[in-house]
């Protein structure tokens, strides 16, 4: 399928997607019932969309195009209420978190969807292993060239986005020792990590043509890059965050990305170069492994900086932009999180260290999501 033209969007408009876990009490393993829930709510959702993701244990909540995080929060709140009621009616529960702590990937059923079934045929078992749960944030752009500039700018802060949202320390019943283990699942895919270097939209079109020759790439949706342009929507989509445990934290993460995008496109603080990506995977690893306790390295100077320190610096830089787009509350909340040193991955480990079971952990996550 040829690449569509870049659809012109109103700059800095927002779209958010949350991949939620559908679980089956009292054992709190993943259920295979997302299709049933989607059918139950389809006539009750007035804004946004509730839809499938790769496997039947995943439920995606997606906003419409929103002008700011307050509008997005309102849409999510309404969807959350409808979905929670439908889940209760079917004796199911819903929670966040980047991974389910003890599910077995072999049990996961790929949705009866042509694209997902084709992807399963192409990639095999990694598709079932990709039963992990992330938050994606779209930011509107006025042109394809703006989208490429924004993508490169946001890529500098991928470690910060991962560290702030880290919520997947457990996988397959084991403490992975990672704050965010979810991104590791995608390492088997040939397009894992950053987008190959291009400097403008024309070069991106040539890149996509080259990728399509493999016959494995039919559309942008078949690419698993950390950040990707979405020409059909006229956006740049950031895909590196774990799904948070609370709706409020998800909204704050979206506000962070929207404010960072506003700062990048209005100030143009960087002249992007291919060398910017030289240590990308090393810095990304630090964030996944250690969260905000990680250390990032400048590819030009070799200077090493604590992620905590660099994240506080980013929040300070984007504060004026956040004020202009009504996202100051998000930046202030994230600032408090960084200063406190708390993150969701550590809270999960603390629960288990205090004697909680992994079953109890999922139960607690369901209570947190329903109570937010």
Curated annotation (Swiss-Prot):
It comes from the Bacteria. One of its GO terms (molecular function) is ATP binding. Pfam families: GCS2. SUPFAM superfamilies: Glutamine synthetase/guanido kinase (SSF55931). Transmembrane segments: none annotated. GO terms for biological process: modified amino acid biosynthetic process. The keyword Nucleotide-binding applies. Keywords: ATP-binding, Ligase, Nucleotide-binding. InterPro entries: GCL_type2/YbdK_subfam, GCS2, Gln_synth/guanido_kin_cat_dom, YbdK. The keyword Ion transport does not apply. Its EC number is 6.3.2.2. It catalyses: L-cysteine + L-glutamate + ATP = gamma-L-glutamyl-L-cysteine + ADP + phosphate + H(+). Homodimer. ATP-dependent carboxylate-amine ligase which exhibits weak glutamate--cysteine ligase activity. Belongs to the glutamate--cysteine ligase type 2 family. YbdK subfamily. This is Putative glutamate--cysteine ligase 2. The gene is ybdK.
């Amino acid at each position: 399928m040829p690449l569509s033209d870049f659809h012109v969007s109103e700059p800095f408009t927002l779209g958010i997607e949350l991949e939620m876990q559908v679980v089956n009490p009292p054992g709190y393993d993943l259920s295979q019932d997302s299709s049933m829930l989607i059918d139950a709510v389809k006539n009750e959702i007035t804004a946004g969309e509730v839809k499938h993701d790769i496997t039947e244990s995943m439920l995606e909540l997606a906003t419409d195009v929103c002008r700011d995080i307050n509008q997005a929060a309102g849409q999510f709140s309404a969807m959350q209420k409808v979905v929670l009621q439908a889940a209760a009616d079917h004796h199911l529960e819903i929670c966040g978190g980047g991974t389910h702590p003890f599910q077995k990937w072999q049990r996961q059923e790929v949705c009866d969807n042509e694209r997902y079934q084709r992807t399963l045929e192409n990639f095999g078992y990694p598709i079932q292993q990709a039963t992990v749960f992330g938050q994606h944030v779209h930011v509107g752009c006025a042109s394809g060239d703006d989208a490429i500039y924004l993508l490169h700018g946001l890529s500098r802060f991928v470690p910060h986005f991962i560290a702030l949202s880290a919520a997947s320390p457990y996988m397959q019943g084991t403490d992975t020792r990672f704050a965010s283990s979810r991104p590791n699942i995608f390492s088997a895919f040939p397009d894992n990590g950053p987008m190959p270097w291009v400097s403008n939209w024309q070069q991106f079109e040539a890149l996509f043509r080259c990728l399509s020759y493999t016959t494995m790439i039919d559309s942008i949706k078949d690419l698993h890059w950390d950040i990707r342009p979405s020409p059909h929507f006229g956006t740049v989509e950031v895909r590196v965050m774990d799904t948070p445990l609370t709706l409020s934290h998800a909204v704050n993460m979206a506000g962070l990305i929207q404010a960072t995008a506003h700062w990048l496109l209005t100030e143009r603080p960087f002249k992007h170069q291919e060398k910017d990506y030289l240590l990308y995977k090393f810095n990304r690893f630090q964030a996944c492994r250690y969260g905000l306790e990680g250390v990032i390295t400048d590819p030009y100077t070799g200077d090493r900086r604590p992620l905590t320190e660099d994240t506080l610096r980013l929040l300070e830089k984007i504060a004026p932009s956040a004020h202009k787009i009504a996202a100051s509350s998000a930046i202030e909340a994230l600032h408090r999180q960084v200063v406190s040193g708390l993150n969701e991955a550590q809270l999960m480990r603390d629960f288990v260290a205090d004697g909680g079971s992994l079953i109890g952990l999922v139960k607690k996550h369901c209570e947190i999501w329903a109570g937010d």
